[in-house]
């Protein structure tokens, strides 16, 4: 399924439950037919936000937004992108007690998906 179609389906499903919503903030990422990235974030009632750079979601959104604005730049290599994502996530979750003890980072390229786990503070 194309990421554009999946994000539209998910948006409609969330909007249908708007009076008794699922308390989620989904992020849909993938590659379009031409190989360009597709990024979409939604709120709990399915209002989509399409972007070309990055999407943040969750309880540490303000911290993540600031970190990503300062560290992200266009046309990063996959390893450089992973390192940037990791630094942003770890710095942000350290400042937010509700964010959990780590993260899983998925880097999607035309060659495949690379997934790595990060461990954060455990206190």
Model-derived regions, located:
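Long, low-complexity N-terminal extensions
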Residues: 1-123
């Amino acid at each position: 399924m194309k990421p554009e179609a999946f994000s539209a389906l998910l948006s409609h499903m969330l909007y249908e439950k708007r009076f008794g919503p699922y308390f989620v903030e989904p992020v849909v990422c993938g590659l379009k037919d031409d190989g360009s990235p597709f990024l979409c974030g939604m709120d709990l009632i399915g209002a989509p936000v399409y972007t070309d750079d990055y999407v943040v979601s969750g309880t540490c959104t303000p911290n993540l937004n600031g970190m990503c604005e300062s560290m992200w730049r266009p046309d990063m290599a996959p390893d450089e992108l992973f390192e940037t994502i990791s630094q942003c996530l770890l710095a942000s979750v350290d400042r937010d007690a509700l964010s959990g003890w780590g993260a899983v980072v998925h880097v999607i390229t035309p060659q495949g998906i690379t997934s790595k786990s990060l461990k954060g503070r455990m206190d």
